Amino acid sequence: MNLEYGPEYEDFRAEVIDFCKEYEGISFENTSNKNISRSEWQKILIEKGFIARAIPKEYGGFGGETDIIKSRIIATEFSKAKIPGGMGGQGIDMLVPTLLEWGTEEQKQQYIEPTLHGEMIWCQGYSEPNAGSDLASLQTKGELKDGNWVINGQKIWTSTAQYSQMMFCLVRTEPQAPKHSGISFILIPMDTPGIELSLIHISEPTRLHLI
């Protein structure tokens, strides 16, 4: 079995190494002549195809093919050069793939690009006071009234809630269905009337919230 990368991948590795040399010493702090904002850095990485590689251009990605070997080369060379990667977080890592697979075209157009570029921050509304890893036990309920969802319940252990503009949330919308069914994935603006945040006091600097 030949585990060596072919010429195409070695050419790509050379491209990544040259990029890392160009941005050696990059900083997000105002202490370097190579200071750059995180949003600017995110844009550069997307344009080069070093992140969001397989996300279509019409949604703010690079528009390339999925290639696990190139992804490994990028991660390896960035690590060697101590070059920061792109933004992560629950929006980019969890919501964007979900929307690409299951979202409507309107949702894809509205949410994916600003999320990829760090302009829209998301938190995750899964765990509840009585439903942690067993999400089939969740009790937050959603009822459709006059074309809008009315949601009542609590979510807990929610990180980044204080910074987030949006939350993707699991809600029981069919209360008569079996416990593993009747659950909907709903996108909720965090400035929706009725949403309240309560800080859960744990060791700093971690901040989690009850919603």
Report the location of each language-model feature:
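Single conserved hydrophobic/aromatic residue that forms the stacking wall/gate
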Residues: 200-211
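Short beta-alpha junctions and helix-cap segments that line functional grooves
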Residues: 111, 138, 156, 198-199
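A structural signal for short hydrophobic beta-strand segments in well-ordered beta-sheet cores
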Residues: 140-143
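A short core secondary-structure module
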Residues: 148, 152-196
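Active-site-adjacent elements of ketosynthase-type condensing enzymes
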Residues: 130-138
